[in-house]
């Protein structure tokens, strides 16, 4: 299997403004998750998992929501969501754009981290 054909895992970190966690999650679940789910079903994505910290941490909380996506390969990661999927799930493109803009407005920070697996000795 060539390097290009290997799965690629990326962590997407979100630091949500205090008091807006529920609104952010509602928008994510309504607008972003269905797009990810459709791409899981199509095979572009191999796995999607979402996490929240269980505890408040040690006083330094860099993120409040994290999504880990495993793409089938680098090409899948570099492609954008198929516009046909977006149109089929969200015929009201203006509403989707407004709600996605609002979701981003609720953030203090957002960053993506592509991961390189470190093989542990056996």
Question: Which sequence ranges carry the predicted segments?
Answer:
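A short glycine-rich, hydrophobically flanked beta-strand micro-motif that places a catalytic Asp/Glu
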Residues: 47-51
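Active-site-flanking beta-strand signature of metal-NTP-handling nucleotidyl enzymes
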Residues: 7-15, 66-67
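Short, flexible turn/loop "capping" segments at secondary-structure junctions
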Residues: 2-8, 58-61
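Short acidic-aromatic low-complexity motifs
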Residues: 16-20, 73
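A cross-kingdom feature marking solvent-exposed beta-strand/loop segments within repeated
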Residues: 53-56
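An amphipathic, aromatic/His-enriched active-site/gating alpha helix that lines ligand/cofactor pockets
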Residues: 31, 38-46, 60-64, 68-122
């Amino acid at each position: 299997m060539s390097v290009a054909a290997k799965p690629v895992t990326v962590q997407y970190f979100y630091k949500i403004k205090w008091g807006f966690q529920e609104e952010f999650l509602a928008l994510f679940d309504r607008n972003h998750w269905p797009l990810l789910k459709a791409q899981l079903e199509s095979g572009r994505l191999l796995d999607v998992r979402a996490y929240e910290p269980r505890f408040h941490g040690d006083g330094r909380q860099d993120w409040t929501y994290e999504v880990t996506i495993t793409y089938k390969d680098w090409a899948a990661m570099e492609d954008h969501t198929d516009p046909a999927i977006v149109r089929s799930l969200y015929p009201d493109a203006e509403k989707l754009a407004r709600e996605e803009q609002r979701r981003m407005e609720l953030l203090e920070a957002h960053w993506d981290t592509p991961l390189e697996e470190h093989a542990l000795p056996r």
